[in-house]
């Protein structure tokens, strides 16, 4: 389906037009028109793209790797399309969070995808603190040069948990490194490629049986409210 859409699109919006052109060549697709569309020009290009869609043109949006909008460009455009009633259709493709969850052996549900962690230490600390008591696994992307620093911050804030460092997913050098968050400093400094991190859910203390916590969690979820508030109520109860 993806190939058919790329073959028939009037214009392909691409995070990197060179990589998009290479993809089309590998798929035997010729004569396509491309428009550069990425985080730093999305706002200025949006009206031009919307005009083409209003005229009935068929446009395709692709990212360098993974799925558009999931830590990739496209959110503002898709939101604008929905507000105007312009049709948007997803095309199944590679997604690092889904691939990592399917093979890491860490509880997949519930989970929260955080995208890329903030670059600054204070920002990372604030984000991880906000999600520290949210039930379920946490998933995020991180650069190789910030990985160990981010994991050290996570270990300090989140406490003992399961950890999976997944790199180069679905590629030739795919690797899953399973460890404990508190032991993350044991990781090699030589990890290369695109890295997806999964941190397992908060661990239940011996003082509170898992069944009791799960029962309390179900009751609090039934009460409603934001996930953060539910987590705080459960934490205070146990």
State the predicted function of each range.
Residues 6-12, 85-89, 137-138:
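Short active-site oxyanion
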Residues 18-20, 66-67, 96, 146, ...:
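Alpha-helix capping/helix-boundary segments
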Residues 35-44, 117-121:
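Conserved helicase motor
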Residues 41, 65-73, 119, 147:
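Acidic, metal-coordinating catalytic cores used for nucleic-acid/nucleotide bond scission
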Residues 46-95, 99:
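Glycine/small-residue-rich loop that forms an oxyanion/phosphate-binding "nest" at active or ligand-binding sites
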Residues 57-58, 137, 144-238:
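A contiguous loop/helix-start segment that scaffolds small-molecule binding in enzyme catalytic cores
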Residues 76-134:
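Class I SAM-dependent methyltransferase SAM-binding "motif I" and its flanking Rossmann-like core
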């Amino acid at each position: 389906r993806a190939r058919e859409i790329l073959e028939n699109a009037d214009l392909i919006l691409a995070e990197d037009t060179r990589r998009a052109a290479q993809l089309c060549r590998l798929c035997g697709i010729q004569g396509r028109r491309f428009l550069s569309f990425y985080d730093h020009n999305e706002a200025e290009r949006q009206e031009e793209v919307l005009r083409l869609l209003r005229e009935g043109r068929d446009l395709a949006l692709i990212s360098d790797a993974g799925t558009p909008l999931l830590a990739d460009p496209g959110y503002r455009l898709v939101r604008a399309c929905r507000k105007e009633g312009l049709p948007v259709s997803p095309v199944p493709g590679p997604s690092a969070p889904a691939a990592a969850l399917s093979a890491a052996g860490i509880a997949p549900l519930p989970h929260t995808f955080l995208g890329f962690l903030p670059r600054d230490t204070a920002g990372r600390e604030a984000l991880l603190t906000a999600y520290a008591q949210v039930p379920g696994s946490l998933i995020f992307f991180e650069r190789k040069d910030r990985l160990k620093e981010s994991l050290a911050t996570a270990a300090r804030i989140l406490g003992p948990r399961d950890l999976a460092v997944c790199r180069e997913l679905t590629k030739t050098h795919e690797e899953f490194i399973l460890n404990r968050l508190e032991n993350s400093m044991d990781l090699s400094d030589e990890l290369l490629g695109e890295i997806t991190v999964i941190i397992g859910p908060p661990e239940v203390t011996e003082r509170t049986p898992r069944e009791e916590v799960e029962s309390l969690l179900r009751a609090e979820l039934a009460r409603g409210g934001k996930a953060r508030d539910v987590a705080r109520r459960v934490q205070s109860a146990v």
